[in-house]
Curated annotation (Swiss-Prot):
The chain crosses the membrane at residues 69-89, 92-112, 148-168, 174-194, 204-224, 258-278, 297-317, 343-363, 393-413, 422-442, 465-485, 504-524. Glycans are attached at residues 14, 495. PANTHER family: AMINO ACID PERMEASE (PTHR43341), ARGININE PERMEASE CAN1-RELATED (PTHR43341:SF4). High-affinity permease for basic amino acids arginine, lysine and histidine. This is Lysine/arginine permease CAN1. GO terms for molecular function: amino acid binding; amino acid transmembrane transporter activity; basic amino acid transmembrane transporter activity; L-histidine transmembrane transporter activity; L-lysine transmembrane transporter activity. It is a multi-pass membrane protein. Residues 1-38 are annotated as: Disordered. It comes from Candida albicans (strain SC5314 / ATCC MYA-2876) (Yeast). InterPro entries: AA-permease/SLC12A_dom, Amino_acid_permease_CS, APC_YAT. Keywords: Amino-acid transport, Cell membrane, Glycoprotein, Membrane, Transmembrane, Transmembrane helix, Transport. Pfam families: AA_permease.
């Protein structure tokens, strides 16, 4: 740990701005220099002492280990997006554009996770980045962003439930779809009331199955490309003779591939959504777990996403009729289609079981993530206080119950418009997630400016993000541009349904932001004071929640055996 950071934590530098650095449970109540925004950080309608909140409601526990944190990030990401919605992406954009889309979103993910890592390791609190926007941008913006991000995960839980039964119907449709949804709805909800260490342990082993399966599929795909399947050597067969770029999505040839690329970004972003989950665990994870997991994000993305997309494009032609056939989402999965096209009989059934496990794991992570975001919003004073209440295991049970209730959206799959409902939910969650990514970058820019104002070098932080501040500005600009243009194709043949599908999350965010602004500051002329619209740098709170962490807590012990070395690399 850099010496300057140690001095800063112990209160020996920057005296003009310094407060004693203590856990959030005490730093707010004991600070003598609270600004309006800082005191609002844990209040509802009146100023509430953080220590009294913990006494009354309890608090989450830091029971997650490094392997748990890494697997939660993987478990929440590798799910419906990768295994199922990539089929729609491949069909719409072709193999090359799909790969380019994945690589482009990879750059956004890298920027966002780097920004998040620098902030979350410095101030490790539950639902961290929802609170960061509240502290460093504005309370109303933070409330809107946090609620929208929570909404995206609550809706994603419903989306996962809508798919799991259809995946099981790959084998049999004797059991009604609603029955499968109900079974997993109840099981996953109940499980999230157990202490977080049990959640972390189960998620570790389920996510381990995912990792082994994805690695196995990549090896299998490589062998098939080289000629082991019934079709002989495939190579780049489906990248030649016009197959590489697909058909585009416009009737004329003007810009049809650009339009396809932009339209396909939503599928790509939905697939990648969840890479930021490592920061959601900040309040329940050890410091070394956070830093280690964030450093490996890029490796996981390149292996689990980019390589998979590459081989899917090599083995499955974009115009394969199976990508759009009726009969359930699993039958549209490029993973299974690649196996079937290669003549493998048993593997599709084995991999379908993996997909079922994957969706269950993702749904589990959806509830966990949403509940911790809601807990963080309550800490920040922008959600009702009762969401802070925890059980003896440190689980915010009201937050869990409220988040899980949105699993009822899964029953939309039982209607005749089930596929349309899936697309609608996918667009809502992807766009909402992208808005949150953009504000993570905005928060990091404000965080860096506040550090600079206080004379604190980023070299002294527990984790220093790469390519800053350029990377943060890149993430902010690209995220907001994509949010605005991702649905532009609806204007070619405009109808209200498609418009709201594309932009409902944007509309919801604006309504929440304006509504919270007037709720917090009223309708008077002071409502539009610049300090209410954007927190002044001198008032940005970078003290509350900073933990007194010693060097040993950041040291990662060396692997003891080959098994430890393997997990040290992949997780």
């Amino acid at each position: 740990m850099p010496e300057d950071y140690e001095k800063y934590r112990m209160g020996s530098s920057n005296e003009s701005h310094q407060k004693s650095v203590q856990p959030i449970s005490s730093s707010i109540s004991k600070s003598n220099k609270k600004t309006k925004h800082q005191t609002d950080f844990v209040q509802d309608s009146d100023i509430i002492e953080a220590s009294s909140i913990n006494d009354e409601f309890g608090e989450v526990k830091r029971d997650l280990k490094a392997r748990h944190v890494s697997m939660i990030a993987i478990g929440g990401t590798i799910g419906t997006g990768l295994f199922i919605s990539t089929g729609s992406l491949l069909h719409t954009t072709g193999p090359v554009m799909s790969l380019i889309s994945f690589l482009f979103v990879t750059t956004i993910c890298f920027s966002v996770t780097q920004s998040l890592g620098e902030m979350a390791t410095y101030i490790p609190i539950s639902g961290s980045f929802a609170q960061f926007v509240t502290r460093w941008v504005s309370k109303s913006c933070g409330a809107a962003n946090g609620w929208l991000y929570w909404f995206s995960w609550a809706v994603t839980f419903g989306l996962e439930l809508s798919v799991v039964g259809q995946v099981i119907q790959f084998w049999t449709d004797a059991v009604p779809l609603a029955a499968w949804i109900s079974i997993f709805f109840v099981i996953l909800t109940i499980f999230n009331f157990f202490p977080v260490k049990f959640y972390g342990e189960v998620e570790f082993w389920i996510a381990s199955i995912k990792i082994i399966a994805v690695f196995g599929w990549i090896i299998y795909a490589f062998i098939m490309v080289c000629g082991a399947g019934k079709t002989g050597p495939v190579g780049f067969r489906y990248w030649r003779n016009g197959y590489a770029w697909g058909d585009g999505i416009l009737v004329n040839n003007n810009g049809k591939y650009v339009a396809a690329f932009v339209s396909g970004l939503i599928n790509s972003i939905f697939t990648f959504q969840g890479t930021e989950l490592v920061a959601v665990t900040a309040g329940e994870a050890s410091p070394r777990a956070l830093r280690s997991a964030i450093r490996k994000v890029m490796f996981r993305i390149l292996v689990f996403y980019v390589l998979c997309m590459l081989f899917m494009g090599l083995l499955v032609p974009y115009n394969d009729p199976k990508l759009t056939q009726d009969g359930g989402f699993t039958r549209n999965s490029p993973f299974l289609i690649a196996m079937e096209n290669s003549g493998t009989k048993v593997l599709p059934h084995i991999f379908n079981a993996v997909i079922v496990t994957t969706i269950i794991s993702a749904g589990n992570s959806n509830i966990y993530s949403g509940s911790r975001i809601l807990y963080g919003l309550a800490q920040a004073g922008v959600a009702p206080k009762f969401f802070l209440r925890t059980n003896k295991g440190g689980v915010p049970f009201f937050a869990v119950a409220f988040t899980a209730a949105f699993g009822a959206l899964g029953y939309l799959a039982c209607s005749s418009q089930g596929n349309k409902a899936f697309t609608w939910l996918l667009n809502i969650t992807a766009t909402a997630g992208l808005i949150s990514w953009g504000f993570i970058s905005v928060s990091h820019i404000r965080f860096m400016k506040t550090l600079q104002r206080r004379g604190i070098s980023r070299d002294t932080l527990p984790f220093k993000a790469f390519f800053m501040p350029f990377s943060a500005y890149y993430g902010m600009v690209v995220c907001f541009i994509v949010v605005l243009i991702q649905g532009f194709t609806v204007f070619w043949d405009f109808n209200a349904s498609d418009f709201f599908t594309a932009y409902i999350s944007v509309i919801l965010f604006v309504v929440l932001w304006v509504g919270f602004h007037f709720f917090f500051y009223g309708f008077g002329k002071d409502s539009f004071k610049m300090s209410n619209i954007l927190v002044p740098l001198d008032e940005c709170d970078i003290d509350s929640g900073v933990r007194d962490i010693n060097d040993a807590e950041f040291d990662i012990p060396p692997p003891k055996n080959a098994w430890d070395k393997f997990w040290a690399i992949v997780a």
